[in-house]
Amino acid sequence: MLGAIARKTVENRILVSRHLISSTSCLFKDNNEELLESIKERIARNRRILQKHSSSHLKAREVNASISNLRQSMAAVQKKQKAAHEPPANSIVNIPSQVSIEVLGNGTGLLRACFILRTPLKTYMFNCPENACRFLWQLRIRSSSVVDLFITSANWDNIAGISSILLSKESNALSTRLHGAMNIKHFLECIRPFQDSDYGSCKYPSQVEERPYTMENYEDAGLKVTYIPLSPPLNIGSNNEKSKNVKVNNVDIAFLIEMKEAARRIDTMKLMELKVPKGPLIGKLKSGEAVTLPDGRTIQPDQVFSSDKVEGDKPLLLVTECTTEDHVKALIDSSSLQPFLNGEKQLDYMVHISDDAVINTPTYRHLMEKLNNPSITHLLINGGNPVIPAVESVYKHTRLLRSIAPSLFPALHPIDWSGIITQNEELSQRQDQFIRVAPMQRYWMRRGASFNEEPIVNNLLAAEPELSDKAKELIKEYQKLEKENKMDCEFPKLTFFGTSSAVPSKYRNVTGYLVEASENSAILIDVGEGTYGQMRAVFGEDGCKQLLVNLNCVLITHAHQDHMNGLYTIIARRKEAFESLGAPYRPLVLVCNRNVLKPMKTYSICFENIEHLLEIVDISRYPLTPPGSPGGPPGKRPRLPSPHLPPSRDVLQDMSSSFDKKAWKLDELKAVQVHHTRMANGFVMRVAGKRIVFSGDTKPCDLLVEEGKDADVLVHESTFEDGHEADAMRKRHSTMGQAVDVGKRMNAKHIILTHFSARYPKVPVLPEYLDKENIGVAMDMLRVRFDHLPLVSKLLPIFREVFVAELFELTIKKEQRVLKDKELSEKRGQLKA
């Protein structure tokens, strides 16, 4: 009996296997879409299985291998699909009919120098600073469409935004090519494991291809780019401090771009004369192929093309960033540039990203004299340009908030700027041969006759916001309270540079908080990408320099990039601030764990040494027993249930001799282990006599409640709205209700909620229970004196009225989610029955 059952089971399995094999074969032949869906379902199923097993288990390794094989199969199918839909690279169809230079950032305000070369088919980006991904939408460009990134010099200002660009892409996106500078891919791989779990994966979705300057050139159907490496002579005996810090392989790269000749236009009259029938034959002629007509005649493409040449073509562009005068000499000596210096050829555009200090040298003036030709347009994008508040969402949103609470939201720099920003040249400034360009400006290299795109216009004219009568009444009542509020304690002062979780949104940047203990002492808690740009908008150029000189310490809660990707910029700008103000340099104290230090060491090795500018206080917790402990295999350190260092740590004991408690006005600083990543911390500090607690990213944490007892103010993350407890638990974050509960148990006098998911771009959900306590909701650019803390909670009724449309949309989404969950629950119940 048992033997019969066994034979029957084997036969059934064989039948099922045959069915699956034939089914899979049919799918590959007939329907790629169904195959992809099937593979995705199997990956999801294997992921669920994987979660049930430890990563060290044999079953886990088998499932991992299965997922990897399935991914390769899916990638192969997607590659075939793309090949079927994309025209060949050498096809005349791929030659762009329009090409324009468009300035994303001119080095001032929120964004460092960068621009794009735009065609209808592709987007080429030159340098990718912090916040580039956040503000690409200004030019109606999705970061997913950026395939080619050209890096003129391997410094942080040029590469800081690349990881955000990569993370924003879909898994089936084309590979991203990094042109020019070396070691960038190596650095990106180093920081990859420290992306926030909110991204869903710590792997970059698209492949990255590095094309260093040693490859000499790049060519596609639209243009040819020649890499011109600029390597100054290496002075072994140089005592120059900068030459000691810059790595030998940091070569500047100039790019010579030459557009392919524009596609010739088909002359309809010639088609009629030659009696070419309508249909696919005309398409082949347009693609440059000869065709045979039904009557046997062979028609060559030249017989039907128009003899008119495209007018206004400016096909040659040179992009340069020379960091020193020696790099300029290398550019002049370059063999690729000799035809232009000798007058044999003429450039049409030259984009200068070099600093003014280099541009004003005799060598650079000599270069300009050699290239002196009225037909060349010299575009200068180097930070010395007009300061224009081009980011409409940031400035208009802050103006709205300032109209509500002027004491809490400062005017952003440039103060009192008002106007309309277009892609024309009205806001540029001419200086000798140069045009100092403004953000968003556009210059045509080729303008097709069919161009009919709606112009981009940012309206930043000073105007009263449109508010309801109820909102105006609430604002009037609030401003009356503002005048009556006592002003007896200015410090400590809190500034919120970023209040978004994981990724920046249109109205919110990622995490960054400033605590000013006095006029001469400041501390930064977390430094997400774009923090320096936000700081520059709040304090202005001169105020920012003074603030950086006053900055004594940076505290990093954990190593996710949305909490530390702006750190390198702060370090570099702080050093420049000391030099600019003529003050002796004072090392910056960096309090962090070892995961923050790993990418920093890689950056120092690959690009520029910054470790000597810091005094590091490592607050890592090592969940390992010392060597030689009993209870494990020889040579292996077994894990303990808890770290051998205490979960709460007095950081002041580990400070160097440069720490001055009186000057810093810092009497207490504790790092408290919280529930996020393995070495994530919250911070408890007593600044200027007041107790402030920063939760960092965490689930509700009892230890933080205990250590932060009776805090004057708690700044707690509130990533999710209530009802998302499962998401919060899975991603190790807190809901709004959980954050408020932590504050109540801590007996905090004031609670400010922050770190909202990007699904709440302007304002999070504002439940009524927030009104019962001193609870406020942080917005970017909120700058609050200590005696103004009671005012923050009074803004909630105004926000409900001002952002009524946004809150209504959030309510609709919540109801839809509840309904969907209910339907799924009912279906599961029916299946079980």
Curated annotation (Swiss-Prot):
GO annotations of cellular component type: mitochondrion; nucleus
Regions of biased composition (Pro residues) lie at 624-646
Question: Is tRNA processing among this UniProt entry's keywords?
Answer: yes
Needs which cofactor? Answer: Zn(2+)
Q: Describe what happens without this gene.
A: RNAi-mediated knockdown attenuates the mitochondrial unfolded protein response as indicated by reduced expression of hsp-6.
Q: Where's the transit peptide located?
A: 1-19
Q: What is this protein called?
A: Zinc phosphodiesterase ELAC protein 2 homolog
Q: Which gene encodes it?
A: hoe-1
